[in-house]
């Protein structure tokens, strides 16, 4: 009716099929992050050890950056993508909502892009890592909903989601 306000359901029905499954977007982000991490690490090693390039002045020691990128940048995308896809099947639960995994994907992806920019503009470092944490935390409520779904075997899903929660801390 004219003038009547109606709630509209947010949906991605018109989006490409790529966005309709959590593992697709998260695995792409993880693979991209893996390639970017390898490129950055190769650049750093070539500069520091082979002396092929000018040594950059990073805001953190290079081994710390490498550890951060691998531990919190590369692997989590694959873990989130897998658990958001397989977890509901293990637990006979409803699938993870599109907005849950797409918001996590967007925030974590933006955070890691910001992190790479922060390597040259250190003032962006906390903002970038804050976006990564926000994305990580955006995914957790949906995963905890799946983990708390009653089923015969919850040990595995509780361990994985508990580990992801611990990783956010």
Predicted regions: what they are:
Residues 1-169:
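Hydrophobic alpha-helical transmembrane segments of multi-pass integral membrane proteins
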């Amino acid at each position: 009716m004219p003038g009547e306000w109606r709630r509209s359901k947010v949906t991605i029905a018109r989006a490409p099929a790529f966005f309709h499954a959590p593992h697709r977007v998260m695995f792409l982000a993880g693979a991209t992050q893996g390639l970017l991490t390898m490129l950055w690490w190769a650049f750093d090693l070539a500069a520091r050890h082979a002396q092929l390039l000018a040594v950059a002045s990073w805001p953190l020691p290079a081994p710390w950056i490498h550890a951060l990128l691998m531990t919190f940048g590369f692997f989590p995308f694959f873990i989130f993508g897998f658990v958001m896809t397989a977890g509901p099947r293990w637990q006979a639960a409803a699938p993870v909502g599109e907005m849950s995994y797409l918001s996590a994907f967007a925030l974590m992806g933006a955070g890691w892009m910001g992190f790479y920019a922060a390597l040259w503009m250190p003032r962006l470092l906390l903002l970038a890592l804050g976006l990564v944490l926000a994305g990580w935390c955006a995914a957790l409520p949906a995963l905890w909903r799946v983990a708390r779904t009653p089923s015969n075997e919850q040990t595995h899903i509780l361990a994985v989601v508990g580990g992801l929660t611990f990783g956010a801390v």
